[in-house]
Amino acid sequence: MTIRERMKKGMLYTDMGEGLEEERIRCKELVYDYNNTRPRESERRSELLKEILGTAGKNIFIEPPFHMAYGTNVHVGDNFYANFNLVIVDDIEVYIGDNVMIAPNVTISPTGHPVDPETRITGKQFSIPVTIEDNVWIGASSVILPGIK
């Protein structure tokens, strides 16, 4: 079974191999470009978000800085706003509906690690998709964990 198949099934996996490192580097470079745009470069930011995200609806704005692992696993609906310091650890899909607002310092992590220390030290992790439905507001410093709907 491939790493990607293990990821999609919620099984334990390591995130090395099968081109995964290169995909994360690609995302980091695009996010770096986004985070270093000037405040008036809103058109450039919109272009970059379309490159970073798997799906990008209309009227999306993310205050820099923000961070993502892959970007392509994040699917955002229309009228989305995220304040400063959004972190999305998108080893697997994150679905964000329409009219969603996210306050500062929010982490969305569909990826977790085993609680058993002997298993955890092997470097394995698991991922379960996260879905944030329409018209949701997420308060400051919230942490969204694997499998949340």
PLM regions: where:
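Terminal amphipathic alpha-helical/low-complexity segments used for targeting or macromolecular assembly
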Residues: 1-59
